[in-house]
């Protein structure tokens, strides 16, 4: 037993130097071992290290492929080597497969999302993918032009019979007075068109429209133009739904066909309205002149007494005074009634 114990102690003492030599040789082997190129998904810091890394990966891939057996999916083989697998994916991205899957695919944008080592170059590639087809945006103006040409070829909504203007030189607007009826100036059996204006002389909107409406007979000599005071022809205003002035209606014969609903009441907008409804083009070089400012439709406000407004104010004041007097009398009666109940 003593010999066995001394033998174990001797082996332990002799084993210490051998263990130290083994550790020294291990450190030496690790120091002599070449450090592989820094890569995360085959992103190298420079081109030389990338080339060295590819050569080392190629040598390692050969025994791996031999151990896996016959040829299989190259992506399965390269999955053992992260750098080579990522190079294969980057090659597919440049071939166009990633663009079909969209930018949200992690295989396409993995490098930029991890470290952003490629810088602005990656964003430039994306912009090229986004704006690679400018022809789609250029096709829209063509479609718009086709739509405009189609609208211009549409038939007018109202087929107006143009009147004969041979021998006529003065084309003016006719204003109806209180005794005249609108139906007397419209032909119920005909298809000629007339533009009728409902206005009031004290309305500032009617006054601002007057010069533009006065110039319309010169722009459309084959059409008729009438104007009437809506306050004097209340029955006609109610019949044709005139709740506000100015109100412009287009008549074909004695039938109203269209109403002008634009807030911008100018000569140009009126020309467009008539052309869209009848298809009749206005004469060129027709503008609002100084004579149109003077008449026949007045362009200045006419100051008159509105008797209806005066009566309304008188009634309102009378009612307020009566209510005030009755309230005071009620206040005097209430205390007396309380005393009677108390007795």
Curated annotation (Swiss-Prot):
Name the membrane topology term. Answer: Single-pass type I membrane protein
UniProt topological domain (Extracellular) ranges: 21-304
Q: Which UniProt keywords apply?
A: Cell membrane, Cell projection, Cilium biogenesis/degradation, Glycoprotein, Membrane, Signal, Transmembrane, Transmembrane helix
The residues exposed to the Cytoplasmic compartment are 326-343
Its main subcellular localisation, reduced to a broad class, is: membrane
Q: Where in the cell is it found?
A: Cell projection, Cilium membrane
Q: Which residues cross the membrane?
A: 305-325
> Looking at the keywords, is Iron present?
no
Chain intervals for the UniProt region annotation (Disordered): 86-112
Q: Where does the secretion signal sit in this chain?
A: 1-20
- Locate the Thioredoxin domain: which residues? 162-279
Q: Which residues are glycosylated?
A: 170, 177, 189, 276
Q: Which GO terms describe its cellular component?
A: ciliary membrane; cilium
**What Gene3D superfamilies is this protein classified in?**
Glutaredoxin (3.40.30.10)
Q: Which SUPFAM superfamilies match?
A: Thioredoxin-like
Compositional bias of type Basic and acidic residues: which residue ranges? 86-95
What is the purpose of this protein? Acts as a positive regulator of ciliary hedgehog signaling. Required for cilia biogenesis.
The protein's name: Thioredoxin domain-containing protein 15
Q: What organism does the UniProt record list as the source?
A: Rattus norvegicus (Rat)
Instruction: Tell me the name of the encoding gene.
Output: Txndc15
């Amino acid at each position: 037993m003593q010999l066995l114990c001394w033998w174990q102690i001797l082996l332990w003492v002799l084993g210490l130097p051998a263990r130290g030599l083994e550790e020294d040789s291990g450190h030496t082997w690790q120091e002599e071992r070449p450090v592989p190129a820094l890569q995360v998904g085959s992103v190298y810091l420079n081109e030389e290290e990338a080339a060295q890394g590819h050569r080392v990966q190629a040598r390692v891939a050969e025994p791996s492929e031999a151990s896996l057996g016959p040829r299989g999916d190259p992506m399965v083989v390269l999955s053992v080597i992260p750098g080579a697998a990522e190079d294969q994916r980057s090659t597919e991205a440049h071939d166009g497969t990633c663009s079909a899957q969209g930018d949200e695919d992690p295989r396409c944008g993995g490098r930029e999302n991890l470290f952003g080592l490629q810088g602005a170059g990656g964003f430039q590639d994306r912009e090229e993918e986004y704006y690679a087809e400018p022809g789609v945006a250029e096709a829209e103006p063509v479609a718009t032009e086709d739509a405009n040409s189609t609208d211009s070829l549409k038939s007018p909504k109202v087929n107006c019979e143009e009147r004969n203007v041979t021998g006529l030189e003065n084309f003016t607007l006719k204003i109806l007075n209180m005794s005249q009826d609108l139906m007397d100036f419209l032909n119920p059996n005909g298809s000629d068109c007339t533009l009728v204006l409902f206005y009031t002389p004290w309305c500032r909107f009617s006054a601002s429209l007057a010069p533009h409406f006065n110039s319309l007979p010169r722009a459309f000599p084959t059409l008729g133009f009438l104007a009437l005071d809506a306050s004097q022809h209340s029955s006609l205003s109610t019949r044709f739904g005139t709740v506000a002035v100015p109100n412009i209606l287009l008549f074909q014969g004695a039938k109203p066909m269209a109403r002008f609903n634009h807030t911008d009441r100018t000569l140009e907008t009126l020309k467009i309205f008539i052309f869209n409804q009848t298809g009749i083009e206005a004469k060129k070089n027709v503008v609002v002149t100084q004579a149109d400012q003077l008449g026949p439709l007045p362009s200045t406000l006419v100051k008159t007494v509105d008797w209806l407004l005066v009566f309304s104010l008188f009634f309102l004041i009378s009612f307020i005074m009566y209510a005030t007097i009755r309230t005071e009398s009620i206040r005097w009666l209430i205390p007396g009634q309380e005393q009677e109940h108390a007795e």
